[in-house]
UniProtKB/Swiss-Prot annotation:
Protein name: Large ribosomal subunit protein uL18
Function per UniProt: This is one of the proteins that bind and probably mediate the attachment of the 5S RNA into the large ribosomal subunit, where it forms part of the central protuberance.
Annotated spans, Disordered: 1-25
Keywords recorded for this protein, A-Z: Ribonucleoprotein, Ribosomal protein, RNA-binding, rRNA-binding
NCBIfam families listed in its UniProt record: L18_bact
Assembly and binders: Part of the 50S ribosomal subunit; part of the 5S rRNA/L5/L18/L25 subcomplex. Contacts the 5S and 23S rRNAs.
GO cellular component: cytosolic large ribosomal subunit
Family: Belongs to the universal ribosomal protein uL18 family.
A Pfam family it matches: Ribosomal_L18p
Length: 121
């Protein structure tokens, strides 16, 4: 009999961490949730009202405004865009949902840019 020990999948661990955190935080109409998803090639941010189940504002590296630069530079532009779009809709305070990722690198760059452009969290 052969026993195979495999390493845990990093994305599965992240999803488990995200589910655990999502049980504790939720977005409302007054203070929606700023959700971040990070892929190998891009970064996506959404401002979500969980009560109504509606996305209020979003931005990603797929937008035409975001194309050049390193992934971290793109994350800064995405943070700026999502903050501008949220502020334009009258949203000033959000709950930051890092999506189970470490608050470091691209996620931190996006959060800092969103703060600089008018979002409070």
């Amino acid at each position: 009999m052969k026993i195979v020990i495999s390493k845990p999948d990093k994305n599965k661990i992240r999803q488990k961490r995200h589910r655990r955190v999502r049980g504790k935080l939720s977005g409302t109409a007054d203070r929606p949730r700023l959700n971040v998803f990070r892929s190998n090639t891009g970064i996506y941010a959404q401002v979500i009202d969980d009560v109504a189940g509606v996305t209020l504002a979003s931005a990603s590296t797929l937008d035409k405004d975001v194309s050049k630069g390193t992934k971290t530079e793109q994350a800064v532009v995405v943070g700026k865009l999502v903050a501008e779009r949220a502020v334009a809709k009258g949203i000033s305070e959000v709950v930051f949902d890092r999506g189970g990722y470490l608050y470091h690198g691209r996620v931190k760059a996006l959060a800092d840019a969103a703060r600089e452009n008018g979002l409070k969290f």
